[in-house]
């Protein structure tokens, strides 16, 4: 990329900066949840909603981000994304109640939903096609560093300052990024078709209401009748979307996508698989602090091996899938992740803390292999005219399933324990043990879906063709 103009290189730095902000925020909060609960006077069992409110908002807003960028311009939308994300961070730091914090996190989610996809679109527009891969590698590298720094930085700030600082650090960075975007980024626009507002609203209502019903089934004071009503509204909204999208060329997501068998299997497996694996980043630091008595900083440091394992496997995952095939790799990694989850719980409860970094490193390797394989299986056989729509739907499903996973983890903690748990007590460890066993079972279930993937020994080379759009 050395032959690119200076202005283009600065624009790539701005996009990389946005990727870093968004990826850092997805992990920095996890280690702070117990301290947030204590400060806000809430049970730690309710704090999963701090993650869910952000991730669910991202899932809901993702389908609109690309259309908005084409309609209004990439600079305007990227600037708006940074401003909303920064304002959300400020309101998070100022929150005095859990409900205020959840609303502020939702505002952050609106910004986060636009930041990454619009950043990808910007790179596509400002960089020559032959240099696209090199440019994307450059701008996504900070996005890989964010998860590495996030847990430890979050723990450090909580332990030596307060949880408010995990949000306050975004403010000066966001101001600089917003100013740089206005000064340096071009405002590309494109001819757009009419936005499928009806489909967008139906999907948004369906996802939000069903997640709320799932969370409301334990400990929120919702009556059974209210929960049944929420479920009914959510199901009706999704059914109406299917009817709306049938034979509708302007639908948000075409139902023609599901004519491709690998897409249908990959999407179903990704949805189920990320429900299970989405529990782990939330549960691990909470378990280390509340279940085992680790300090926030120590718990954050323990997450680094998992990220390193994940980054290490990205270099060889293509060769692994080409050698063994999607079906074998996905079934093996799904069952393997379930076993590693049990191994983590066992070694932790036995007090073998020196083994935990190695177990978490292994967990990161297995999880990364499964994620990359799920993404590429889902997209690799789609025709070119459906590839963009399929990638957008996969991105939305990824975020939705992660929010559902965190919600289920919170429900399991509430099911097996009381609303008030004490740090490092025998009862609390029993609660976490039952929760961890349930998680391992849920993580293993998608193996039944992946076992239906057809043998594809001659199609695995396609993984490299679609990998770019899936990341």
Swiss-Prot record:
Swiss-Prot/TrEMBL keywords:
Cell inner membrane, Cell membrane, Membrane, Transmembrane, Transmembrane helix, Transport
Gene3D superfamilies, per database record: MFS general substrate transporter like domains, Multidrug resistance protein D
Q: Which GO terms describe its cellular component?
A: plasma membrane
Cited InterPro entries? EmrB-like, MFS, MFS_dom, MFS_trans_sf, Multi-R_MdtD
HAMAP family given in the database record: MFS_MdtD (MF_01577)
Q: What name has this protein been given in UniProt?
A: Putative multidrug resistance protein MdtD
- Specify the domain of life of the species encoding this protein: Bacteria
Q: Tell me which family the UniProt entry assigns to this protein.
A: Belongs to the major facilitator superfamily. TCR/Tet family.
According to Swiss-Prot or TrEMBL, what is its membrane topology? Multi-pass membrane protein
Q: Name one GO molecular function term.
A: transmembrane transporter activity
Q: Where in the cell is it found?
A: Cell inner membrane
Record topology, Cytoplasmic segments: 33-48, 98-101, 159-164, 218-224, 284-285, 363-395, 452-471
TM ranges: 12-32, 49-69, 77-97, 102-124, 138-158, 165-185, 197-217, 225-245, 263-283, 286-306, 342-362, 396-416, 431-451
Periplasmic topological domain ranges are: 1-11, 70-76, 125-137, 186-196, 246-262, 307-341, 417-430
């Amino acid at each position: 990329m050395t032959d690119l103009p200076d202005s283009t290189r600065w624009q790539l730095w701005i996009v990389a900066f946005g990727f870093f902000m968004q990826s850092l925020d997805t992990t920095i909060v996890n280690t702070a949840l117990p301290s947030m609960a204590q400060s806000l006077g809430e049970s730690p069992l309710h704090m999963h909603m701090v993650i869910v409110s952000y991730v669910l908002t991202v899932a809901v807003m993702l389908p609109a981000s690309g259309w908005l960028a084409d309609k209004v311009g990439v600079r305007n939308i990227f600037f708006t994304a940074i401003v909303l994300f920064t304002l959300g961070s400020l309101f998070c730091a100022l929150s005095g109640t859990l409900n205020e914090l959840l609303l502020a996190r939702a505002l952050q989610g609106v910004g986060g939903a636009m930041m990454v996809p619009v950043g990808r679109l910007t790179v596509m527009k400002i960089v020559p096609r032959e240099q696209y891969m090199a440019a994307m590698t450059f701008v996504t590298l900070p996005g890989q560093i964010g998860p590495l720094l996030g847990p430890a930085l979050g723990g450090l700030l909580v332990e030596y300052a307060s949880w408010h600082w995990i949000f306050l650090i975004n403010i000066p960075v966001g101001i600089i990024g917003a100013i740089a975007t206005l000064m340096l980024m071009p405002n590309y626009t494109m001819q757009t078709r009419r936005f499928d507002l009806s489909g967008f609203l139906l999907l948004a209502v369906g996802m939000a209401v069903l997640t709320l019903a799932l969370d409301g089934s334990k400990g929120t004071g919702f009556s059974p009748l209210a929960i049944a009503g929420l479920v009914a509204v959510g199901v009706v909204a999704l059914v109406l979307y299917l009817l709306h999208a049938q034979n509708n060329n302007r639908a948000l997501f075409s139902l023609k996508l599901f004519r491709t068998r690998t897409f249908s299997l990959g999407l179903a497996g990704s949805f189920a698989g990320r429900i299970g694996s989405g529990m782990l980043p939330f549960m691990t630091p909470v378990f280390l602090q509340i279940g085992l008595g680790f300090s926030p900083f120590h718990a954050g440091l323990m997450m680094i091996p998992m990220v390193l394992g994940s980054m290490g496997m990205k270099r060889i995952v293509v060769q692994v899938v080409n050698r063994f095939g999607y079906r074998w790799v996905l079934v093996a990694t799904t069952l393997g992740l379930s076993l590693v989850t049990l191994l983590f719980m066992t070694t932790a409860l036995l007090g073998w803390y020196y083994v935990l970094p190695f177990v978490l490193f292994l967990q990161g390797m297995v999880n990364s292999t499964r994620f990359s394989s799920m993404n590429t299986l889902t997209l690799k056989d789609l025709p070119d005219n459906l590839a963009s729509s399929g990638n957008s739907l996969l991105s939305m499903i990824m975020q939705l399933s992660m929010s559902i996973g965190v919600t289920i983890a919170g429900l399991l903690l509430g099911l097996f324990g009381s609303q008030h748990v004490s740090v490092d007590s025998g009862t609390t460890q029993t609660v976490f043990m039952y929760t961890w066993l349930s998680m391992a079972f849920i993580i293993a279930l998608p193996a039944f879906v992946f076992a239906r993937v057809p043998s594809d020994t001659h199609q695995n080379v396609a993984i490299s063709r679609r990998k770019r759009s899936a990341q």
